[in-house]
Amino acid sequence: MWAGGVGSPRRGMAPAPTDDLFARKLRQPARPPLTPNTFEPRPARGPLLRSGSDAGEVRPPTPASPRARAHSHEDASRPAATPTRLFTDPLALLGLPAEEPEPTFPPVLEPRWFAHYDVQSLLFDWAPRPRGTGSHTEANSGTLAEGQTTTSDLLLGAPGFVSELGGEGELGLGGPISPPVPPALPNAAVSVLEEPQTRTTTYSLEHADLGAGYYRKYFYGKEHQNFFGLDEALGPVAVSLRREEKEGSGGGTLHSYRVIVRTTQLRTLRGTISEDALPPGPPSVSPRKLLEHVAPRLSPTCLRLGSASPKVPRQLLTLDEQVLSFQRKGGILYCRAGQGSEEEMYNNQEAGAAFMQFLTLLGDVVRLKGFESYRAQLDTKTDSTGTHSLYTTYQDHEIMFHVSTMLPYTPNNQQQLLRKRHIGNDIVTIVFQEPGSKPFCPTTIRSHFQHVFLVVRAHAPCTPHTSYRVAVSRTQDTPAFGPALPEGGGPFAANADFRAFLLAKALNGEQAAGHARQFHAMATRTRQQYLQDLATNEVTTTSLDSASRFGLPSLGGRRRATPRSPGADVQAAGALMWGVRAAPGARVAAGAETSGPDDAEVPCLLGISAETLVLVAPRDGRVVFNCACRDVLAWTFSEHQLDLYHGRGEAITLRLDGAPGQAVGEVVARLQLVSRGCETRELALPRDGQGRLGFEVDAEGFITHVERFTFAETTGLRPGARLLRVCGQTLPKLGPETAAQMLRSAPKVCVTVLPPDESGRPRRSFSELYMLSLKEPSRRGGPEPVQDETGKLVILPPTKQLLHFCLKDSSSPPGPGDLTEERTEFLRTHNSLSSGSSLSDEAPVLPNTTPDLLLVTTANPSAPGTDRETPPSQDQSGSPSSHEDTSDSGPELRASILPRTLSLRNSISKIMSEAGSETLEDEWQSISEIASTCNTILESLSREGQPISESGDPKEALKCDSEPEPGSLSEKVSHLESMLWKLQEDLQREKADRAALEEEVRSLRHNNQRLLAESESAATRLLLASKHLGAPTTDLA
């Protein structure tokens, strides 16, 4: 029948009538296309855009005529409603426009060289998308769907909530990752990019907009201009502009403009643009020209200059810092054994012993009457909300807890409204469970404000072995937050570490809940009201065109030159931005792109500042990867792709859009300027006749020995080099055993090698150096370092000459040694940003205002035996030539260690510049303190050389090498830090005292002039009175 019988559909028989609307929609005959005759000119061929597939011909779309658009009932931009698409796209099935696909590469804000101050400035969008549903946000947050229904003995899953029972890890690029160790920051804790962010505690505070203090730090109390207006597309807007001048590294003056653009969206555009990046024009830039370049979508005609009232800066502070709060409140519910409902927990009158033990660990029980610190809406005068409460502080935050058993109890009231009035309005609630309690279900709590529940169950309470387990339940529109729970949610010992973990979890939960739909809408309304008030009541009649310029024009009327090449703009301290597609792992090999599937790549915004490198997913606005620029080890690149190695050798792949080599060249130039990394080398190592590769490598991947006259030596492998990738896989992913097995058994070994530094030492990241410094033996109780009496290892000149070297002007550090950084032919030929030399040679080095003290004291410290990995000569047989080269290594060591003191030069120069106005005695006292600091540097640096024994036996030297060196690098670093900080504090204190003294002198002079004027006036009046009275006149003047 189906092959062509009477009832076959192929015979054209009409289908049976049906009431199904979807079936009718599918059976409608296709409308024939309209082809009217038009006489429109043929459109010019534009640039062809590559589609998602490389196959097939790509043609530019032909615009339809107005008549065709007028007679067509379908949108021309809407794709054809094919049956396949109708079944796969429910919106097309209902006749609705489909969702627009996301671009392959996320768009980047103009202007190109605007340096963003923080992460949320990278996410600023002139046309923000409407917020999606809670499920959409949750899908983007990377949380597994099955986690929403996971249950345990602590927590029951519920619709609309996401459960965290332990082992989820931190959300990163490509999925969950292990939590970072200090000094690295979690992704959610990264905020400010222009300034260094350090992790001083085990648990970091996340989801905090620390960039909100940008106006207070760089605008408030300084000369700047504010403009307010009502834009037709953006609504009320507020713009702040300020011109800055700072001394460049070459001695000239650099001008830049700090800009803040506020709209009704919660993300604010904050950053800096150099004057050299602006179009050529007069020597002074008008606010209109500046905003036309920085904010091209903002209508300049709607802006008016803000009033000079002191209310305006204060209101802008309140507007920007409404997301910053250092006073937090939370609720604590007490659940006895066998309880689980909301009414049962609210009706517990007295606290048990296990609950009191938990409260004592968490904070301090304070008397409310007369309490002067943060009270969290509790009555501190009449005890109407109870007599006591729980209060504590953590990381500069004041936290007041609303404890259910400490709030007033109302008999014969099952709901306990006096208690629920406080706890029900808290965003974060801690549910304490005694052993034997029922699992907590978040749907039993009826509240619109409670978004996060931290369930804590005690085990063996009131014993020396008390421990706790933790589970978390949050609403779907609340993003994930740390610290991450361990597998199974614990157990946690009852100590200070558990207290810090729980308080950090509570603070981060409240910050994360601010991104939920309800609180986001409330914050948006508040922000809109502030902006509306400023644009309506705090403006003058001065338009943007009539506003004064930032700089006074010179008499010569010299115009600003044409903007320099982008190489002069990559020096900005803020984050420059590129649109990339990122994936974990390395994919570029020997200049060829071997990218994997597209679904493994994530569209991201790449931001590189002078301190931090971040990848931000613009779809859900979270950081998926971050690392300090001092942790960048190396990079391998091709025309459109770049592999970045960081930390212990981990790698990520970045794919960039644009002209071949242009965007990649910009990123490489930026990395050369802000990091200590270099380009890698791809080596193919054949085996000799005996199947050997001809080199030795340790467990960390450092080359310890290369045999002479082997293929490894011929290809350029040297001791001190570092293996980053073996046969296409990174070393951290392989592990030492697998990498060794692959090196022994692979028929052809292809490796990615990181060359040693200029002094021949292995390159390590800052995180590795930090961990090595913690592992060094303590100096306390150890012998004092022995001074070398031979005179052959005098590495540095005396302290006076070192101080003179640090303070004198030097445009560039000493030249590199024999091992120079290698560059491929691709960068020389295709990089349009440099001609004849790399951008790192053209652009001056960024001044480091916060010197890396750890890197100053030791360039590349290593574990015992690391120096054995970089012998002074290739020959290890103890020949006379080898001993001769080693004994004459003093000048080489001097040349290698002197550049390491340059990172202190900016800090010492700043201190001396601040002390320039002091008296001669104070100045010499400062110099003596700096000299003592330099003596500490000399002591630590002089012990980095490896002395050779008098017998000249290299084996004896290696034996001495393996013994731990007396002294601790951490103590040297702490001593150096304390000296510098003390010196800076003393200088600041002296400056403050001098300013107060000058103010007192001015006051005395003013009073003296006033008294002198009054005495002259009295003498004049007395003289006039004596004349009128006829008395003999005397000259009283």
Curated annotation (Swiss-Prot):
rRNA-binding in keyword set: no
Modified residues (Phosphothreonine): 62
Subunit (UniProt): Interacts with RRP1B; the interaction leads to inhibition of SIPA1 GTPase activity.
Region of interest (Disordered), ranges: 1-85, 830-849, 855-898, 943-969
Top-level taxon of origin: Eukaryota
A molecular function (GO) term: GTPase activator activity
Annotated ranges, domain Rap-GAP: 316-534
Inducing factors: By mitogens.
Residue stretches of biased makeup (Low complexity): 871-881
BP terms from Gene Ontology: regulation of cell cycle; regulation of small GTPase mediated signal transduction
Keywords: Coiled coil, Cytoplasm, GTPase activation, Membrane, Nucleus, Phosphoprotein
Residues recorded with modification Phosphoserine: 65, 178, 299, 309, 812, 834, 907
Start-end of Basic and acidic residues biased regions: 952-962
Role noted for this protein: GTPase activator for the nuclear Ras-related regulatory proteins Rap1, Rsr1 and Ran in vitro, converting them to the putatively inactive GDP-bound state. Affects cell cycle progression.
Expression (tissue specificity): Preferentially expressed in both fetal and adult lymphohematopoietic tissues.
Domain PDZ: 682-758
Name of this chain's protein: Signal-induced proliferation-associated protein 1
Entry keyword rRNA processing: no
Chain segments annotated as coiled-coil in the UniProt record: 968-1025
Record-level GO cellular component terms: endomembrane system; membrane; nucleus; perinuclear region of cytoplasm
Cellular compartments annotated: Nucleus; Cytoplasm, Perinuclear region; Endomembrane system
Subcellular location, principal: nucleus
Topology of this chain in the membrane: Peripheral membrane protein
UniProt xrefs under InterPro entries: PDZ, PDZ_sf, Rap/Ran-GAP_sf, Rap/Ran_GAP_dom, Rap1_Ran_GAP
